[in-house]
């Protein structure tokens, strides 16, 4: 099975940049989108043979996620079970299938000067609880814009970013904690020394210079380790400040 995850930085915007052709070209069984920045009724989009699921923020034009799936899920849920401490920002979709759960997420940004780091860490803890509750029942595939470059190999300029959002010690430790709960970073599992990025700032011609970060992931529960076939970063595909990432897995 082929899975794609892509932060499109605005679905309506990327539709004018060839999104439908890219979607068909990648030909995935599951296509997960983050930062769609829209309500379902704001886009006229439908692909033959796919079920569509949208989770939109209460604040229009902000955050939000979507999944297109060739398989009909057994169940669909949105956000965490307990949203008492979380604003409705449309960040999570969970689909249940016969053999696995698929979770896509648009992780909260810790902001400049780490102004939102406390909430970010609270959110990370809630996500680990969510994934672990699913993992008790069946295998888990977790993907999305996870907003962290885990190790120095995962960004171009680690030395100047240790106190910046996405590479702070706290965020990196939170990702380490996630993996320690029985999960695998599929790309790094297959390619421990490969340097590729999935996000580039719009500033200073960063993409042209390949001054990037790897912050988009497919993470799977350890029981799927032997089923991983390939993990790719499609850095030749434009349309957003992120590029699509791919997981091929035998399910």
Predicted regions located by residue number:
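N-terminal, active-site-proximal structural segment of metallo-dependent hydrolase catalytic domains
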Residues: 1-47, 57, 62-63, 78, ...
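Metal-dependent phosphoesterases centered on the DNase I-like endonuclease/exonuclease/phosphatase
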Residues: 51, 126-211, 215
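Conserved beta strand-loop-helix elements of the APE1-like EEP
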Residues: 60-76, 205-226
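Surface-exposed cleft-lining segments at the edges of enzyme active sites
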Residues: 81-83, 108-124, 160-163
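Active-site beta-strand/loop signature of hydrolases that rely on acidic residues for catalysis
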Residues: 7, 23-41, 102, 130-152, ...
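Structured beta-strand-rich core segments of catalytic domains in phosphoester-bond hydrolases
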Residues: 37, 42-110
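Active-site-proximal beta-strand elements of phosphoester/diester hydrolases
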Residues: 1-9, 99-111, 143
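Active-site beta-strand termini and strand-to-loop segments that position acidic
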Residues: 70, 95-98, 221-222, 247-251
């Amino acid at each position: 099975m082929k899975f794609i995850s892509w932060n499109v930085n605005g679905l309506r915007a990327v539709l004018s940049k060839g999104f439908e052709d890219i979607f068909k070209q990648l030909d995935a069984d599951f296509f997960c989108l983050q930062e769609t920045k829209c309500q379902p009724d704001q886009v006229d989009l439908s692909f033959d043979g796919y079920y569509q699921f949208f989770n939109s923020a209460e604040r229009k034009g902000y955050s939000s996620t979507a999944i297109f799936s060739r398989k009909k899920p057994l169940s669909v849920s949105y956000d965490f079970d307990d949203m008492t401490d979380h604003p409705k920002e449309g960040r999570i979709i969970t689909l249940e299938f016969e053999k696995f759960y698929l979770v896509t997420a648009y992780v909260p940004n810790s902001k400049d000067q780490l102004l939102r780091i406390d909430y970010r860490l609270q959110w990370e803890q809630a996500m680990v609880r969510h994934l672990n509750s699913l993992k008790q029942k069946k295998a888990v595939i977790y993907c999305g814009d996870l907003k962290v470059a885990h190790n120095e190999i995962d960004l171009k300029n680690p030395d100047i970013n240790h106190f910046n959002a996405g590479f702070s010690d706290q965020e990196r430790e939170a990702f380490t904690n996630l993996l320690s709960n029985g999960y695998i970073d599929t790309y790094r599992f297959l390619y421990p020394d490969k340097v590729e990025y999935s996000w580039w700032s719009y500033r200073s011609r960063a993409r042209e210079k390949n001054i990037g970060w790897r912050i988009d992931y497919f993470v799977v529960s350890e029981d799927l380790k032997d089923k991983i076939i390939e993990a790719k970063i499609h850095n030749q595909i434009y349309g957003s400040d992120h590029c699509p990432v791919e997981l091929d897995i035998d399910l």
